[in-house]
Amino acid sequence: NTSLPDSQKKYASNGFGYVGAPNYAAGYALAEEAVKRAKLQAGDSVFVWGLKGQGGDRGQRTVGVLDAFTKAGAKVIYQEIDAATNADPNAGTATFVGVMGANPGIKIVVTDHGGLTSNVGVYAQAAGLKAGQVYFAGFDMSPNTAQAVKDGFQNLVIDQQPFLQGYLPILNICLTKKYGFSGLDINTAGAFVDKANVDAVAPLAAVEIR
């Protein structure tokens, strides 16, 4: 679900589209919403654990997060997700504990990675944090993420609605083949999940509809 804007522009009339989350916009929106909900003040510290170093469109989601926090006047502590943690989120536990221990005033943590987002309960408890002590925001619903929301560790998640990401591209191909339609361009990341609506979303996340 990473866009290819140059190819899309060139081949849109032939059915080339994009169904997913515009990465920069999704990152910016998540951080902006976290700023409001956590009542962040200028000068407060935030920890962004991201993939800026990947570059390209994927790296833009982290850039969006960083830009929103910078605009809010936050003190940003950034940590690139290393290869080991990217492959196995549990491998990042020591990194998280180290960052939080060195920066005890962190108010918001953003994990720009679905696997890390699903693991925030493990990270928080390893760092000695109680539920709600730090505001966690991240990307992608999963059963573990839903449980972390229910437990009070995960506060805010952008839901990318993976059913739409799988269904609509196939529909796009069929419509292009049958009717010559141009490519669809659809943002599937329009919803936030939190404790107020997680009970409705969790069963759908378990079967990868949400």
What does each model-found stretch correspond to?
Residues 18-45, 92-93, 141-145, 160-178:
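Hydrophobic alpha-helical segments within soluble ligand-binding/sensing domains
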